[in-house]
Design a protein with these regions (language model features):
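Sec-dependent N-terminal signal peptides
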Residues: 4-14
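A Zn2+-metalloprotease active-site environment signal
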Residues: 2-4, 21-252
Length: 252
C-alpha cells in the first residue's frame, strides 16, 4: 500500500478553487483541515476504536462462514500454531464466503480471509499469507493505513463546509467508505517485504514449514491477470517468492 501524505494539501487546494465561486464556511474548512492533520496523529486507542467499527461494518456487508462450516474449521486449525498477541491485540480470524481471492488485517487484530483464497492455497501456503497479514498488524502498517484512510475521509468535511450538514459521527455509509479506503490503500514495497520477513520468521520460530510462502506468492503471481484482489495491495509476488526462496536456501 502507498501511504498517502497529501490529504490536507488536496483539501486546501479544493477550498482554494471553490472559494471564489460561493460563500464558504471558514470554520468548517478549518475543521476539515484539522481533521486531516489529526488523522495522522490518532492514538493507538482511537485507531483500534475505528478498526473495531470498520471491521463490524465489513462483517455486516459480507457472508461470514459459520462456526461449524468447513472453512472456519480449517482456518482455526491453520492459525492455531500462529496465534499470538499483536501490538497488544488478540487476533480474531473469520472467513468471508466469497470467491474473491483476498485477505486483510486491521490494527485491532481483525483478520479476514476470503474463501476464494482458501480454495487456492494448501495449509502451509495459507499460513504464510496469514503470517504476512499478522506482520502488517504487529509492525504498525495496519495502523498507518487506517490513519491514512481516516485522513482522506476529511474531504467530506470540505463538502459540509459549503452548506451540507456536518458529519459528527460515522454512520454505516461513512464506515463503508472508511473501510473501502482502508482496503484500497497500498502498502509500500518496504512494508510488504517487512511483513514477508515477519511471516517467515514466525513460521521458523514455530517450527512450521516456510516453503508455503514461496508457492503462495507464485500462485498469487499467476493470478495477476485480475482474479486476485489481494494482488492490488501485494505487488511483485514473483520477486517476493524468489526472495523467500533465497531465505530458505540461506537457512539450510
Amino acid at each position: 500500500m502507498t501511504f498517502r501524505m497529501g490529504a490536507l494539501a488536496a483539501m486546501l487546494a479544493v477550498a482554494g478553487l471553490t472559494a471564489g465561486c460561493q460563500t464558504m464556511d471558514v470554520g468548517g474548512l478549518v475543521g476539515a483541515g484539522s481533521k486531516a492533520v489529526q488523522a495522522f496523529s490518532l492514538s493507538d486507542q482511537e485507531v483500534v476504536a475505528l478498526s473495531d467499527q470498520s471491521c463490524k461494518q465489513m462483517d455486516a456487508e459480507h457472508k461470514v462462514a459459520s462456526t461449524n462450516s468447513k472453512y472456519n474449521k480449517r482456518l482455526q486449525r491453520v492459525v492455531k500454531p500462529l496465534t499470538k498477541q499483536l501490538n497488544g491485540q488478540t487476533p480474531n480470524f473469520k472467513v468471508y464466503q466469497t470467491q474473491e481471492v483476498n485477505a486483510w488485517a486491521m490494527a485491532n487484530g481483525c483478520i479476514r480471509v476470503y474463501a476464494g483464497l482458501m480454495d487456492k492455497m494448501n495449509d502451509d501456503e495459507l499460513r504464510g499469507v496469514i503470517g504476512h497479514e499478522m506482520g502488517h498488524v504487529e509492525l504498525g502498517h495496519s495502523k498507518k493505513a487506517m490513519q491514512t484512510a481516516y485522513g482522506l475521509s476529511a474531504a467530506r468535511d470540505v463538502a459540509a463546509a459549503t452548506g451540507n450538514s456536518v458529519v459528527t459521527q460515522l454512520n454505516s455509509s461513512q464506515l463503508g467508505e472508511l473501510s473501502e479506503a482502508f482496503l484500497n490503500a497500498q502498502f509500500s514495497q518496504s512494508q510488504e517485504s517487512a511483513a514477508d520477513d515477519y511471516s517467515f520468521d514466525l513460521l521458523t520460530e514455530r517450527k512450521l514449514k516456510t516453503q508455503g510462502l514461496v508457492s503462495a506468492f507464485e500462485k498469487l503471481a499467476a493470478l495477476d491477470g485480475g482474479e486476485s484482489s489481494v494482488m492490488s495491495s501485494h505487488p511483485g509476488s514473483k520477486e517476493r517468492a524468489q526472495r523467500m526462496q533465497q531465505r530458505i536456501d540461506a537457512a539450510k
